[in-house]
Structures are given as C-alpha cells and as structure tokens.
C-alpha cells in the first residue's frame, strides 16, 4: 500500500484508518488514531459537510491530522470507490443508527470480500441488534447517558443532570479506539478480520458500574451527590475554601487521623464508630459522618486554597484546586508538560488547544496538520487507490465525489 503524503511518527505509523461519522463519538476515535501516527481518512457527505464544521473552534482540534474524502459511498461508482479503498484499509469505523450500513447493502461480509483482514467498528446508540423499538433510534450523548443509568446517578439530590461536555461521546469514541486496536492485534496474528458492535448505552452502563453493583447485588440505590460531595464517603468531593473551591479525597488511616486532629475531631478516633485502622468515613452508616462534614466545612471555609493545599500536602491528603479555564495555561504543571499547545490551521491561523495525549516516550504523537477543508484530499486519496484524473472527474460530474474548490 502506498501511503498518502504525511510525516512518519507515532506508534501507529503505517496503519490506515477510515471513518464515516459526524459530530463527536465516531470521529473522536479517528482523532486518537491520527494523533498517534495512523493515516486517517475522514469520509464526508458530498452534498453536506460534517455538521461539526459549523462550530467556530472545536473542529480545529477534533479534525486535525486528518485526510478529507468527500464521497457518496452508498451509490454506484461511489460505492465501488469506497470498497476499493477498503482493500487497503486496516480499520474502518462507522457511526450511525443501528445497522444502517447493512441496510444499505454494505455488510461486514461485503467488506470482508474486499479485505478479509479488515477490522470493522460499528458505533451506534443502541447497538447493531436488539429490539425494533430501540435499535434504529438516533442517539447522542444525553440519550446514551439517560438510557444507561449513568445520568440518574449524576447531578444533585434535587435533580439528576447529564455529565458534560458530551461524556458519552468521548467514552464511546475511546472504546472504539481501544477495541479496534485489540482487534487489529488479533487480526495480525490470525489473518481473519473482526467486526465490533459498540453500543453507546452499554459503554455508559459499564462506566456507571461502581454504584450500580450495590443495586444488582443487594438492591441498594446510591443517593446522588449533595453540592458535589461524594454520596457515600465524608471528606470526599467538592468543598468550599475561603477563596474558592477544592476537591479532596480523605482516604487512608494516617490521613484521617491527622485531619481529624486539625479539625477538632481527635476525640472520636479509636471509638467503636471510628475504630483504629479506619480508612474511610461513610457519611451515612457512620454516626459521626454528618459531624465530620460539619467540622471539615468550617475548617476549610476559614482557610485559603493555598493554605489547605500546603497542609494537605504535608498530610498526604489528595486534593486539588478547581481550576477555571483561564487558569489552565499558566499552571506550572501545564507549562512543564506542554499540556496546551498551538498549531497552524490550513488557512494559516494559529489555533490553541489540548496537546497530544498520552505522551509516548519512544514514538511520540504529533500535530502535523490542521483540519482539512471539505473534499480537500478527495483527489489524492482516489489517485492513491488507482483512479485516474479522468475517473475522478467523472465521479465529480455525477455528484458522487467532491474535490477541493
């Protein structure tokens, strides 16, 4: 396979990934591959560009490092070109409503006829099969959260709230990435392709597992948070200091002992309710739970964030200031690790945003390109798989492909 022009870098150099999907979930999987060195081709509708393009800034992050192909993959010669592309593809990711590709004639079996080693990842709200009531429904972040039991666990005691920004999309996209890589590893061992069925609600069901297990194995429903505090454990969650907010996790024998001395609760240490060796204080089951919260709230409110951080560092209590977005760039840890970076857009502007993560020591990721325009790489991609200038012109003339203006 001849690769498209791009630098060689990262742990996935030489892997070709193609994705078809809009907005966040499916494309996020493609974005991860692209930042780790894979050659990633982004398929867009010929007539209508990905709706993410209407956003002013986010697409410059979510579509960097990609090659843009505008092709009608379901019709006539456009379908033929797509299947030709699949012959040189390692991983194909599609995000749609249920088995939408199969309904339009592009089944796993059709794809494997053209490439028996292809890894196919189907990402949808409710999966590729199930009941007619759900399988073909559209789904976004909040739908997956609501249907999975994840949303009902978030929010405050007064009202459930979805977790933002777009948590289900990102978890599902990352699941597609990891599952596809696992499948690719096996394919290289066996030579046999794989198809992966990723239902967003099942991803969120698994991500919401912690408290659910108490219900599935005992019928206990965990309450939601109160003002950002852990529903089970005292000293864990969001707290207000004299000049802002911190989060903390009061976990550990020494940590509890020393913290209780600071906040005036040394007398309850070693009691039947807080016996020696206590590592966590249950806010409901422990009779002293409410008192711990009361004393801790008062102590924190009387101290600045800096003072609290310094003291908790001495006690080895995990805590962090709740940073505002403007505070991120100047934070010394962000600066030291270059967590925020800049890159050039295709029209020559400078864009700022999150850097590549995670950080590979020997084969680091790289930002080599901004978001391509609609159809920017169509001609180059089609030439790469054997199409002539005349062939491409014919596809464009029939409305089956779009090249950059």
Curated annotation (Swiss-Prot):
Q: Which GO terms describe its biological process?
A: carnitine metabolic process
Molecular function (GO) terms for this protein are: L-carnitine CoA-transferase activity
Q: Where does CoA bind?
A: 97, 104
Which coarse location class applies to the principal site listed for this UniProt protein?
cytoplasm
Where does it reside?
A: Cytoplasm
Q: Which Pfam families match?
A: CoA_transf_3
Offer a single GO CC term for the protein.
Answer: cytoplasm
Output the superkingdom of the source species: Bacteria
Which key words tag this protein in UniProt? Cytoplasm, Transferase
Q: In which pathway does it act?
A: Amine and polyamine metabolism; carnitine metabolism
Active-site residues?
169 (nucleophile)
Tell me which EC number(s) this protein carries.
Answer: 2.8.3.21
Q: Which cysteines are joined by disulfide bonds?
A: none
Q: Family per UniProt?
A: Belongs to the CoA-transferase III family. CaiB subfamily.
Can you say what this protein is called?
A: L-carnitine CoA-transferase
Gene name, please? caiB
């Amino acid at each position: 396979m001849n690769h498209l022009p791009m630098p060689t870098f990262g742990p996935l150099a030489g892997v070709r990934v193609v994705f078809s999907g809009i907005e966040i979930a499916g494309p996020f999987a493609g974005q991860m591959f692209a930042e780790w060195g894979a050659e990633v081709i982004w398929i867009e509708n010929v007539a209508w560009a990905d709706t993410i393009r209407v956003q002013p800034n986010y697409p410059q992050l979510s579509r960097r490092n990609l090659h843009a192909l505008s092709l009608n993959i379901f019709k006539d010669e456009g379908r033929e070109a797509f299947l030709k592309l699949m012959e040189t593809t390692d991983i194909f990711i599609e995000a749609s409503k249920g088995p939408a590709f199969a309904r339009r004639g592009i089944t796993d079996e059709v794809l494997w006829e053209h490439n028996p080693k292809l890894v196919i990842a189907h990402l949808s709200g409710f999966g590729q099969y199930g009941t007619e009531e759900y399988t073909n429904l559209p789904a976004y972040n909040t739908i997956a959260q609501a249907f999975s039991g994840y949303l009902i666990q978030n929010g405050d005691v007064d009202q459930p709230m979805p977790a933002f920004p777009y948590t289900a999309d990102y978890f599902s996209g990352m699941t597609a990435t990891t599952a596809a890589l696992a499948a690719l590893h096996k394919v290289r061992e066996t030579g046999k392709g794989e198809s992966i069925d990723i239902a967003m609600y099942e991803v969120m069901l698994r991500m919401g597992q912690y408290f659910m297990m108490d219900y599935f194995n005992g019928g206990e429903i965990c309450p939601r948070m109160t003002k950002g505090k852990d529903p089970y454990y005292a000293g864990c969650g969001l707290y207000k200091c004299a000049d802002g907010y911190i989060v903390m996790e009061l976990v550990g024998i020494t940590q509890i002992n020393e913290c209780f001395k600071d906040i005036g609760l040394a007398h309850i240490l070693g009691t039947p309710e807080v016996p020696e060796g206590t590592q966590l204080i249950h806010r409901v089951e422990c009779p002293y739970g409410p008192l711990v919260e009361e004393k801790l709230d008062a102590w924190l409110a009387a101290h600045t964030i800096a003072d609290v951080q310094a003291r908790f560092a001495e006690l080895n209590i995990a805590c962090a200031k709740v940073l505002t977005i403007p505070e991120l760039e100047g934070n010394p840890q962000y600066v030291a690790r270059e967590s925020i970076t800049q890159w050039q857009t295709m029209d020559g502007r400078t864009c700022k945003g999150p850097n590549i993560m995670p950080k590979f020591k020997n084969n680091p990721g790289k930002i080599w390109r901004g978001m391509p325009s609609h159809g920017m790489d169509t001609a180059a991609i089609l030439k790469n798989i054997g199409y002539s200038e005349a062939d491409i012109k014919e596809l464009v003339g029939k409305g089956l492909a779009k090249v950059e203006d």
